[in-house]
Amino acid sequence: MGKIIGIDLGTTNSCVSVLEGNEPIVITNSEGKRTTPSVVAFVDGGERKVGDPAKRQAITNPTKTIYSIKRFMGETYDQVSREVERVPFKVVRGDNNTPRVDIDGRLYTPQEISAMILQKMKKTAEDYLGQEVTEAVITVPAYFNDAQRQATKEAGEIAGLKVRRIVNEPTAASLAYGLDKSNKDMKIAVFDLGGGTFDISILELGDGVFEVKSTNGDTHLGGDDFDHVIIDWLAEEFKSQEGVDLRQDPMAMQRLKEAAEKAKIELSSTSSTEINLPYIMPVNGIPKHLVMTLTRAKFEQLADRLIQACVAPCETALKDAGMSRGDIDEVILVGGSTRIPAIQEIVEKIFGKAPSKGVNPDEVVAVGAAIQGGVLTGEVKDVLLLDVTPLSLGIETMGGVMTRLIDANTTIPTKKSEIFTTAVDNQPSVEIHVLQGERSLAKDNKSIGRFNLDGIAPAPRQTPQIEVTFDIDANGILNVTAHDKATGKKQNIRIEASSGLSDDEIKRMKEEAQANAEADKKEKERIDKINQADSMIFQTEKQLKELGDKFPADKKAPIDTALDKLKEAHKAQDVAAIDTAMAELQTALTAAGEELYKNVGAAQGGAQPGPDFGGAQGPSVGDQPSDDKNVTDVDFEEVK
C-alpha cells in the first residue's frame, strides 16, 4: 500500500507530512522550507508559480497573485463580498452564484486555485519519498460547513489526490499532541487561530481514544484580519497626511499588506516596529514615502475587537461540552496567529491557565493529518478518533421553519431519520430543502442543497409518510435520502452541488490540472536544457581562451562552428536545436582533446596528464599512473 500523506491546507501557509517508521516527518519543500505560502501567481507567458516564488513577485504582479483563497472555498459570491473588496486580484460572480477569480478572462474556481497549492504539496511529498503519491488526508477548520468541506475534497480530486479523510484541524492537532500520551486521561482545549479561520475544540483523551466533545469557531477570523487593521491604520494615516487613499492602488496595497504582516510578526517579540515604505506612491508628481512607527499597545488597541471575538466561541464550546474551565488539563495553541502576545493573554484569561507551547503551531496540524493517514493504513494502531459535526443539520418545513434532524456536536459518523408528511391535499411531490446552522428560521441558515421527491400517491394532506434520512460520513459530508413509504419511491442527494461544481466540471478541472502539471514539468526540462547550454558555452569559451592556440586548425574550426550554432540555439531558446548543437560541440571537443593529447604525448615521449575537453558534461582525461622508479618510501610517525 502506498503512503497516505497529511496536508494542512492553510489560508496563509500549507504544510505536508508523512509517516516514516511510525514517526511523522514534516517534509521540506523545493525552496528548503517546512511550510509553503498558500499563494498562486500567473505570470506573463502563461507560467504559473506556487509558494515562495509566487509570494516574492506579488508586489510587481498584485492583480494576478492569488492568496487567502481558502476564505472563498464553498461560499457563494454574496457571502464573500467583504473579502472581494479586500483583495487586489479580480473576483467575479460565476455560475451558481459562486466566486471565481478572473485572470485575463479565464475564470478559476477557488477549488482550482487550492488544487494548485495541493499539487505543490503532492510534488513535495513525491520528491521526498521517491514515489508517486495518490492519497491524502486533508485538514479543514472544525467550523467549516458542508459546502466548504466538499469544496476542499473537490480541490484534492482536481489535484489528482484521492482524499481518504477530511479531518478537523484542532482534532488533527490533538492527535499530534496526544499520541504519546494516549494512556493518560486528559481533557484538552485546542485553540486554533490561523491565517483565515478560528476554531476551538474541547476533547477528551484516554486509552487511545480521541473524542471531540464540542467545537465552535468563526471561519472568517484569522491573521488576515489582524493584518487588515494595520493596513487600514496605515492607509488612513497616509490619507490624512497626503490626501490619497493607498488602498485604491493594487501595487501600493500589496506593499501595505506585506509591511503589515511583517509588522504584526515583529510585534510578537518587540514592543514597537518601524514601517518604512519608500516611494509608496506619487502625489502630484512627487514621490511620497511612508514612514510610521507602530507600537504593540497601538496594535492591540486596533485589534481589540478581533481579540475579544475569540472569547464567546470558547465559552460556548465549554458549555456545549458540559465542562468548566477548571476541567481543562491543557490548552494547546495552533496556528501562526497564536504567537500574538494579546491572544496568549486572552487564552490564559478564558481558561485560567497558561497555554502549552509544546507543539509547533505551524506544523502540528499536518503532523496530525499524517498520523490519521497512518491510522487508515494500519501503521498506527489502537487509536480511535471520534469527531463531531460542527453545525446542526435539518430541513425546511411549513412556515419557513428549520426542523433539526442532527444537532451540532453530534459524534460522526451518524445517521438519523424522521417522518414528515404533505401540507396540501393530493400533493404530487415534496421539495427537500437541506439546511445547516443554529437559527430557528430556514432563511437565516446556510442552504446546502435541494431536491424533489416526485410520484407521491394522491392522498389527503398529512396522510403520506415521507421518511427523511440524514447520513453523515467520517469526513463530515452529508448524504440525504427521502423515501415515500406508501409507493416505495426514493430519492437521495449527496450534498455536492452546494460547492457549485458538477461532476463534469470537476473532471474537466482535474484533466486541466494534470495537463498543467505536465506542462510545468516540460517547462522545467526546457529551462534546465537552456541552462546546460549556457554552461557549455561558458566552459568551451574558457577552454578556447586557455588552450586554443594549441589546437590544430582543422580541429578548432569544427569547435567554432558548433559553438556558434549552440549560441544561436541558446539565444532562440530552441530546445531541439540546443540538443543537436550540444551533441555536435561535444563531438568536436572530444576530437580536439584526443588530437591535442596525442601531440603532447608524442612531444614529451610519454603519457602526461591531459587537458579536460569535455565542455559542460564531457569526459576528462585523468592523471596517469606514475612510474614506480619515481616513488620514494617514507616512514612516518603518527602524532596523537
Curated annotation (Swiss-Prot):
Protein species of origin: Porphyromonas gingivalis (strain ATCC 33277 / DSM 20709 / CIP 103683 / JCM 12257 / NCTC 11834 / 2561)
Known role: Acts as a chaperone.
Biased composition (Basic and acidic residues): 626-640
Annotated keywords: ATP-binding, Chaperone, Nucleotide-binding, Phosphoprotein, Stress response
Modified residues (Phosphothreonine): T197
High-level lineage: Bacteria, Pseudomonadati, Bacteroidota, Bacteroidia, Bacteroidales
Name the UniProt record assigns to this protein: Chaperone protein DnaK
Induction trigger: By stress conditions e.g. heat shock.
Family matches, as PROSITE patterns: HSP70_1, HSP70_2, HSP70_3
One example GO MF annotation: ATP binding
